């Protein structure tokens, strides 16, 4: 093997990822009712440009074309999410039209020879549930159980890979704590309560999967980052440990160890009110690592201590160059360090799947082509980190590039492009970027 050859295991899973609200559009078609993101987008100043997902990539009408394009680009696996408000538009109502959309999508996926990974929850909570208190209320867990059961009953034998929850950190902390995401609340007590209930839904889905005797694999996806201290000063080291507890350990430790990290419980103090939202049996329900751990990784953080009144009393040091269009540092060495740490501290041999990794770049369409060399470079360097981890015995079994299409990038609207396929939002024309063509060649050779 030459020094520049990175060949992956024969069974390695190559895929691409999307999510329902970011690509589907058709928000008032097919019996769908509003999600919390439809409502959030109407709040002035919450989303850049006042953008929303009403049309997005219009995947609702273009799904056949999109799946065919995946096939042409050589993908073997496709990770997508189901829009909960398409399935449960109101309390006690199951919408057959919504189920049919995903049935037809799965027909296309199977015709194209792709293997599906279905995400049950990627942030589009039905607004009617939020009106009842959303993720701060335990009743939402029962609504989720009904929804997950319907999906499993309808599609159970067609799904090879189940992703219970995508990024519980973002859904809870950004949604109920910082207010950056829907529903836009700024209440730390609500945020930690929401996080607990969302983690419980992972356990609920895992139990349903067992009870129904489904043969597909099931697991959760966490967004995790490698955290470095800005200096060796004790206060900066302690600040970095807090940041790690906030974004990584608060979600990984319940899944793998059945408890919340004690140092963070102590630090959060009154915001948790003695963890009074934790009832007997909750932690046992959550502590179900499943068949795999999904990881979404984009960048590292460099943290120093502050003396302000914020929750963590930390701040992010300015990212070092090079950075993506999000301003996120490109640091593949941290990806390798994170994977090594995850296996050592948490997964301990459980298969790991990279369910998202990619970069927003300022792409330019010139003569019908997009030479996104920055994105290509980002992906290639991060795949080298994956390869190194595997070579050292790491149980990494697959990589899903984010994202298949340019799409609605949450609070950033349409101002950031993560896709390996360019979208002209006026015409809905799809144009594979240079990174997609490189990825096709790479998958065909199972390496580079």
From Swiss-Prot:
The gene is bglB. It catalyses: Hydrolysis of terminal, non-reducing beta-D-glucosyl residues with release of beta-D-glucose. GO terms for molecular function: beta-glucosidase activity. It comes from Paenibacillus polymyxa (Bacillus polymyxa). It is an enzyme of class 3 (hydrolase). Pfam families: Glyco_hydro_1. It comes from the Bacteria. GO terms for biological process: cellulose catabolic process. Keywords: Carbohydrate metabolism, Cellulose degradation, Glycosidase, Hydrolase, Polysaccharide degradation. This is Beta-glucosidase B. InterPro entries: Glyco_hydro_1, Glyco_hydro_1_AS, Glyco_hydro_1_beta-glucosidase, Glyco_hydro_1_N_CS, Glycoside_hydrolase_SF. Its EC number is 3.2.1.21. Belongs to the glycosyl hydrolase 1 family.
């Amino acid at each position: 093997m030459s020094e520049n050859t990175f060949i992956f295991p024969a069974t390695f899973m190559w895929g691409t990822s999307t999510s329902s609200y970011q690509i589907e559009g058709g928000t008032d078609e097919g019996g769908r009712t509003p999600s919390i993101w439809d409502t959030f987008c109407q709040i002035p100043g919450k989303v850049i440009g006042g953008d929303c997902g009403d049309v997005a990539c219009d995947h609702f009408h273009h799904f056949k074309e999109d799946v065919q394009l995946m096939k042409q680009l050589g993908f073997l696996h496709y990770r997508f999410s189901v829009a909960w408000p398409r399935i449960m538009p109101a309390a006690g109502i199951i919408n057959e039209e919504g189920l049919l959309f995903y049935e037809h999508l799965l027909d296309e996926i199977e015709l194209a020879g792709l293997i599906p990974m279905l995400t049950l929850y990627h942030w589009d909570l039905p607004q009617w549930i939020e009106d009842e208190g959303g993720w701060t209320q335990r009743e939402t867990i029962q609504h989720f159980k009904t929804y997950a059961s319907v999906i499993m009953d309808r599609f159970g034998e067609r799904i090879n890979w189940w992703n219970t929850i995508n990024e519980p950190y973002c859904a809870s902390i950004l949604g109920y704590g910082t207010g950056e995401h829907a529903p836009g609340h700024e209440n730390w007590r609500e945020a930690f309560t929401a996080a607990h209930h969302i983690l419980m839904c992972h356990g609920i889905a895992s139990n349903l999967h067992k009870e129904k005797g489904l043969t597909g694999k099931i697991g959760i996806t966490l967004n995790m980052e490698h955290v470095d201290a800005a200096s060796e000063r004790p206060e900066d080291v302690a600040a970095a440990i807090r940041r790690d507890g906030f974004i990584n350990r608060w979600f990984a430790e319940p899944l793998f160890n059945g408890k919340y990290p004690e140092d963070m419980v102590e630090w959060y103090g009154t915001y948790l009110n003695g963890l009074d939202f934790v009832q007997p049996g909750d932690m046992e329900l959550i502590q179900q690592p499943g068949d795999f751990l999904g990881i979404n990784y984009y960048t590292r953080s460099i943290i120093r201590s502050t003396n302000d009144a914020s929750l963590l009393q930390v701040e992010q040091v300015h990212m070092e160059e090079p950075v993506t269009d999000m301003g996120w540092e490109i640091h593949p060495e941290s990806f390798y360090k994170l994977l090594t740490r995850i296996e050592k501290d948490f997964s301990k041999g459980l298969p790991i799947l990279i369910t998202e990794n990619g970069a927003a770049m300022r792409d330019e369409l010139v003569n019908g082509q997009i030479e996104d060399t920055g994105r290509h470079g980002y992906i290639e360097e991060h795949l080298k980190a994956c390869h190194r981890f595997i070579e050292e015995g790491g149980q990494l079994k697959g990589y899903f590039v984010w994202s298949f299409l340019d799409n609605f990038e949450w609070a950033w609207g349409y101002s950031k492009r993560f896709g390996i396929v360019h979208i002209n939002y006026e015409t809905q024309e799809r144009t594979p970027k240079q990174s997609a063509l490189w990825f096709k060649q790479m998958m065909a050779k199972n390496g580079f």
